[in-house]
UniProtKB/Swiss-Prot annotation:
This is Small ribosomal subunit protein uS12. It comes from Rhodospirillum centenum (strain ATCC 51521 / SW). InterPro entries: NA-bd_OB-fold, Ribosomal_uS12, Ribosomal_uS12_bac. GO terms for molecular function: rRNA binding; structural constituent of ribosome; tRNA binding. GO terms for biological process: translation. Transmembrane segments: none annotated. It comes from the Bacteria. The keyword Cytoplasm does not apply. The gene is rpsL.
Length: 123
């Protein structure tokens, strides 16, 4: 515990919050090119093959982003748009690819929460 005199000499430094999505550089979304599309396994206690892509962004950052929804058409050199948002059971995955934008197709036969998956309204 500092004394009053110590606090006068050197005041308390404010806590600085660390940026959760540094690669976006304060932008809502960023465009990038897939350099590798692959599956990975989540940490315990979950079990699955989660679809992820390594994306090189327009600002030079290279990040791992999650591909949401069932089925996708992404491959190497696909141009994608990413947003922030981590995947809790995949360490190091702090971004999501936006479905239905640029080279990413929307999810087929999606009926609920369609706007999140780039799906058109069914007839």
């Amino acid at each position: 515990m500092p004394t009053i005199n110590q606090l006068i000499r050197k005041p308390r430094a404010p806590l600085v919050a660390r940026d959760k999505v540094p690669a976006l550089q304060e932008c809502p979304q960023k465009r990038g090119v897939c350099t590798r599309v692959y599956t990975t396994t989540p940490k315990k206690p979950n079990s699955a093959l989660r679809k992820v892509a390594r994306v090189r962004l327009t600002n030079g950052y290279e990040v791992i982003s999650y591909i949401p929804g069932e089925g996708h058409n992404l491959q190497e050199h696909s141009v994608v748009m990413i947003r922030g948002g981590r995947v809790k059971d995949l360490p190091g995955v702090r971004y999501h690819i936006i479905r239905g934008v640029l080279d990413t197709q929307g999810v087929k036969d999606r009926r609920q929460r369609r706007s999140l998956y780039g799906a058109k309204r069914p007839k």
